[in-house]
């Protein structure tokens, strides 16, 4: 291992804003702990006092200052750190590191950028450099060109053909970007994008709407060892920002050939870029032809990193921080198992679903259409043995008054054309409208998939929840008798267990049967239908777990120790 720096400056992510929620605080807190474990003095600069990372016991010294390059330069002058770690504070940290380098501050005070170098950051964040580098290493990208004016944008858009995607450089959450269907819309989006870009640059890109969006979270150390932490699949197709889409991990609809193709491409890209630490790589995949495009590379801990970390139990930010000070993947112990190392790729024997949380309840007049720019202010994550179970758990966690997946009374009575429009156009109620269409028999799985661009596999899973609801209602008399007497035959008990495995809450079942929620709970517990707990241990039970965490489900075997 190389010589460890004595003092490191970590750049925090600042306030919680649209597109940037608490995931970066989670990452920064992990990093502070990881560096102090190695005896490194940690100096933290963050403008947000309402975070975990600014707690007194997280860093040796905390500066609550605006996240501005000139202010960070003064802190560097005062503290004289050996290194700066900018990859844990989201886009803000990267932008400040690049500005400090351009100002000559890092060279003047002999401060090393730890982990991913400034050159690599620029190569991934500058739209022109990224496109040129991907072509150089033989990875396919969308036809695109970086521009700095509206007139240039018009010329490029005419050449590529409408619609086009506008992506500002050095921004987070698609801020300032969008999809332009015509010249008038292009002018509006480009003007806004240039205003938001730190370097007055936007990328005009070929639109691959309807292609599947797949992400890989990848780790690499300074010796070139690489692993994939996990794959993630957006339920919505390309055209909706990954932070605005329901995301499932691991990817559910990829063939083995597609998975290996994209995994190999992800490892090739992180190695060629020379990223040291965590990296998120986004792909667009055409199902029919098998073609793919590299959409974006985030050479930092990102929103998706926080999801991948919690989904797998693999502490990405902690390991990225240790890699930044010179440790290799095979030197960093996996704290969950206590006997494997960070070079061991996580294995998942469960399904994780992430759903964004939009503030439309606070802003009822806002435009609810979703696109390439984020509108959500947070997200929830749920774990289950099946996609259906995890999806219903996640919907309950949103705290929007829904006990699970099901349409609102308005959606049950809405005009069929209104339901079709809401399925065709991405919006926060799309998954509920798909449920309504299936429940009302308005559309088939194939029609919904064709209209929305959502893979039929996901629509089939929603259909299974609808069918389970119908079956509960069909067996209403039998279930009410069970609730009244507390007695049931084996078939009924197994049916109740299957209902719970599909993610139905006691409240949902009670609403369908017209009884009290407590009656459902009492009856099922009386016949042994109770939650069991399964491990999130990074290795699918291949090794014993020292410090795992658990998720609840309704299988026979419980992996948690019971204390009666």
UniProtKB/Swiss-Prot annotation:
Binding site for Mn(2+) 2: 296, 298
Binding site for Mn(2+) 1: 282, 296
Organism classification: Archaea, Methanobacteriati, Methanobacteriota, Methanomada group, Methanopyri
Function: Large subunit of the glutamine-dependent carbamoyl phosphate synthetase (CPSase). CPSase catalyzes the formation of carbamoyl phosphate from the ammonia moiety of glutamine, carbonate, and phosphate donated by ATP, constituting the first step of 2 biosynthetic pathways, one leading to arginine and/or urea and the other to pyrimidine nucleotides.
Pfam families tied to this protein: CPSase_L_D2, CPSase_L_D3
An MF annotation (GO) of this entry: carbamoyl-phosphate synthase (ammonia) activity
Name of the featured protein: Carbamoyl phosphate synthase large chain, N-terminal section
Alphabetical keyword list: Amino-acid biosynthesis, Arginine biosynthesis, ATP-binding, Ligase, Magnesium, Manganese, Metal-binding, Nucleotide-binding, Pyrimidine biosynthesis, Repeat
The protein's annotated pathway: Amino-acid biosynthesis; L-arginine biosynthesis; carbamoyl phosphate from bicarbonate: step 1/1; Pyrimidine metabolism; UMP biosynthesis via de novo pathway; (S)-dihydroorotate from bicarbonate: step 1/3
SUPFAM superfamilies, per the entry: Carbamoyl phosphate synthetase, large subunit connection domain (SSF48108), Glutathione synthetase ATP-binding domain-like (SSF56059), PreATP-grasp domain (SSF52440)
Self-association and partners: Composed of two chains; the small (or glutamine) chain promotes the hydrolysis of glutamine to ammonia, which is used by the large (or ammonia) chain to synthesize carbamoyl phosphate. Tetramer of heterodimers (alpha,beta)4.
Reaction it catalyzes: hydrogencarbonate + L-glutamine + 2 ATP + H2O = carbamoyl phosphate + L-glutamate + 2 ADP + phosphate + 2 H(+); hydrogencarbonate + NH4(+) + 2 ATP = carbamoyl phosphate + 2 ADP + phosphate + 2 H(+)
Species assigned in the record: Methanopyrus kandleri (strain AV19 / DSM 6324 / JCM 9639 / NBRC 100938)
UniProt domain ATP-grasp: residue ranges: 131-325
Description of its domains: Corresponds to the N-terminal section.
Signal peptide stretch: none
A GO BP entry: 'de novo' UMP biosynthetic process
Cofactor descriptive note: Binds 2 Mg(2+) or Mn(2+) ions per subunit.
Keyword Repeat: yes
Family listed: Belongs to the CarB family.
Top-rank taxon, per record: Archaea
UniProt: Mg(2+) 1 binding residues: 282, 296
Carboxyphosphate synthetic domain: region residues: 1-399
């Amino acid at each position: 291992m190389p010589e460890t720096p004595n003092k490191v400056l970590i750049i925090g992510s600042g306030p919680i804003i649209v597109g940037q929620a608490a995931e970066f605080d989670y990452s920064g807190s992990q990093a502070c702990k990881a560096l102090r474990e190695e005896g490194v003095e940690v100096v933290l600069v963050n403008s947000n006092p309402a975070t975990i990372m600014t707690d007194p016991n997280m860093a040796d010294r905390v500066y609550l200052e605006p996240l501005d390059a000139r202010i960070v330069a003064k802190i560097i002058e005062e503290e004289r750190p050996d290194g700066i770690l900018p990859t844990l504070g989201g886009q803000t940290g990267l932008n400040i590191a690049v500005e400090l380098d351009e100002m000559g501050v890092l060279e003047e005070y002999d401060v090393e950028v730890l982990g991913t170098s400034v050159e690599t950051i620029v190569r991934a964040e500058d739209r022109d450099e990224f496109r040129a580098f991907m072509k150089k290493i033989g990875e396919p990208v969308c036809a695109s060109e970086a521009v700095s004016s509206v007139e240039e944008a018009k010329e490029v858009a005419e050449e590529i053909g409408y619609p086009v995607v506008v992506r500002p450089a050095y921004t987070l959450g698609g801020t300032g970007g969008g999809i332009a269907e015509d010249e008038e819309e292009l002018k509006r989006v480009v003007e806004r994008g240039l205003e938001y870009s730190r370097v007055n640059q936007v990328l005009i890109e070929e639109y691959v709407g309807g292609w599947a969006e797949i992400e890989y979270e990848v780790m690499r150390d300074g010796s070139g060892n690489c692993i994939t932490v996990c794959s993630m699949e957006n339920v919505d197709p390309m055209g909706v920002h990954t932070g605005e889409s329901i995301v499932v991990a691991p990817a559910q609809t990829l063939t083995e050939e597609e998975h290996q193709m994209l995994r190999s491409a992800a490892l090739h890209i992180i190695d060629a870029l020379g990223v040291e630490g965590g990296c998120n790589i986004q792909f667009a995949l055409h199902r029919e032809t098998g073609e793919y495009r590299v959409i974006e590379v985030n050479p930092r801990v990102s929103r998706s990193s926080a999801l991948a970390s919690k989904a797998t139990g693999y502490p990405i930010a902690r390991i990225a921080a240790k890699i930044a000070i010179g440790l290799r993947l095979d030197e960093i112990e996996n704290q969950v198992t206590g006997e494997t190392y960070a070079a061991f790729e996580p294995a998942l024997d469960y399904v994780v679903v992430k759903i964004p949380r939009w503030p439309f309840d606070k802003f009822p007049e806002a435009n609810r259409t979703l696109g390439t720019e984020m509108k959500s202010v947070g997200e929830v994550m749920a774990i289950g043995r099946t996609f259906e179970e995890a999806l219903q758990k996640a919907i309950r966690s949103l705290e929007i008054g829904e006990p699970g997946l099901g349409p609102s009374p308005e959606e049950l009575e809405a005009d069929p054309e209104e339901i079709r429009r809401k399925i065709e156009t991405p919006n926060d109620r799309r998954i509920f409208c798909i449920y309504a269409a299936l429940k009302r028999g308005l559309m088939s799985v194939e029609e919904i998939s064709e209209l929305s661009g959502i893979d039929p596999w996901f629509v089939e899973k929603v259909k299974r929840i609808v069918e389970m609801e119908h079956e509960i209602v069909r067996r209403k008399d039998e279930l009410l008798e069970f609730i009244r007497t507390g007695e049931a035959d084996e078939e009924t008990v197994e049916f109740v267990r299957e209902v719970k495995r599909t993610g139905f809450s006691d409240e949902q079942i009670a609403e369908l049967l017209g009884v009290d929620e407590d009656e459902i709970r009492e009856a099922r517990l009386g016949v042994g239908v109770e939650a069991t707990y399964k491990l999130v241990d990074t290795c699918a039970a291949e090794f014993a777990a020292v410090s795992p965490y658990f998720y609840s489900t309704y299988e026979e075997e419980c992996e948690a120790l019971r204390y009666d």
